[in-house]
Amino acid sequence: MNEQPAACRIKVEALGAGFAPAAEQWAERLGLALQVDEAEFALQVGEQGLQLQQLGPDAPGPVRVDFVEGGAAHRRLYGGGSGQMIAKAVGVAQGVRPRVLDATAGLGKDGFVLATLGCEMSLIERQPLIGALLEDGLARAAQDAEVGPIVARMHLLKGNSIELMRNWQGEPPQVIYLDPMFPHREKSALVKKEMRLFRPLVGDDNDAPALLAAALALASHRVVVKRPRKAPCIEGPKPSHGLEGKSSRYDIYPKKALKA
């Protein structure tokens, strides 16, 4: 996701006096103000953690990261385990739990699914506001007895995905997973809410070809790209094959076989 466009006016807001110190800390870290005239978004700090709220009469509800309850918990318990398409795409199999870099982490949903299945995950989210939501969600989840051991496998990195991949230090990830923002329209309520919120902040990933090139250069075993089902492949080398679902597909770029 692209860095925050300057046109968006964002303030940090404490949802109660007791959260003012934390709000000040987030404002300082992110270079945001506590008071902004005609703000379009509020990064709110309250008892449920950090959340991003679009302002205005037609704004959807707040977006926050919650790995303990809600959709993440339901998918963890009932989501299909290693039979899920994303698991097959990254190469999860009997005795195989690859080390995965999710270079477009967003709110961490796909990374959490893979961590639940036992994969060691590195995550990069280059949009600072979304990265802050993810950092806060991981910190809260770490305190939960059931979910804590799962998020302990999720390691959040800060910075630009392409630069971090090009300058990677140490053992490379076996699999790199990409889900670039694509200018498409879907009708589910969840997509509406999150995409309506994020699109003004992050735009589309116009550097997706460079993202793919950096991933192919770094990954030791394969690169997986999630796309809307009918969207074209990312410009560049073509995938060897794909897995297709109802609304999305996974383009797979293998380099060598994953073995137990």
Swiss-Prot record:
GO cellular component terms attached to this protein's record: cytoplasm
EC number(s) from the headed UniProt entry: 2.1.1.242
Primary localization class, coarse: cytoplasm
This protein's UniProt keywords: Cytoplasm, Methyltransferase, rRNA processing, S-adenosyl-L-methionine, Transferase
Binding locations of S-adenosyl-L-methionine: 125-126, 179
EC class (word): transferase
GO MF terms, alphabetically ordered: rRNA (guanine-N2-)-methyltransferase activity
Transmembrane spans: none
Family: Belongs to the methyltransferase superfamily. RsmJ family.
Role noted for this protein: Specifically methylates the guanosine in position 1516 of 16S rRNA.
Protein name per UniProt: Ribosomal RNA small subunit methyltransferase J
Lineage: Bacteria, Pseudomonadati, Pseudomonadota, Gammaproteobacteria, Pseudomonadales
